[in-house]
């Protein structure tokens, strides 16, 4: 039986921390979908098409990973993709409370949907897309935290 997992998020933009999680998930499951949420209420810097394109390029070295955009409830998207595993990254204890609420709601909406929590490697444990964008806005060097294509796109957006 083939295992299919979904790693959802806004990924505005995708960081090396996200790539760390997805790379490890790709070694655990037969197929992994990086599901990029439209998230219009978050007012993303990059639109959905841009985020999908950036992530697709950054993840092209992982043959069992597919990048898709979505705007539905996660449980509905998972059901439509016939996936029953949800990957979530936990950077710190503070993330756990919110992630636990999401996991319980997703389980309520789709009882067969299991949430699997992965901690990022120590090197990436403190970064987030929001933090990287904030540092970049103030001319800080974020090269180390982003794939090259994403770094270039971020610098273009900030011009």
Curated annotation (Swiss-Prot):
Pathway: Cofactor biosynthesis; coenzyme A biosynthesis; CoA from (R)-pantothenate: step 4/5. ATP binds at residues 10-11, 18, 89-91, 99, 124-130. Its EC number is 2.7.7.3. SUPFAM superfamilies: Nucleotidylyl transferase (SSF52374). It holds the Pfam family CTP_transf_like. One of its GO terms (biological process) is coenzyme A biosynthetic process. It is found in: Cytoplasm. This is Phosphopantetheine adenylyltransferase.
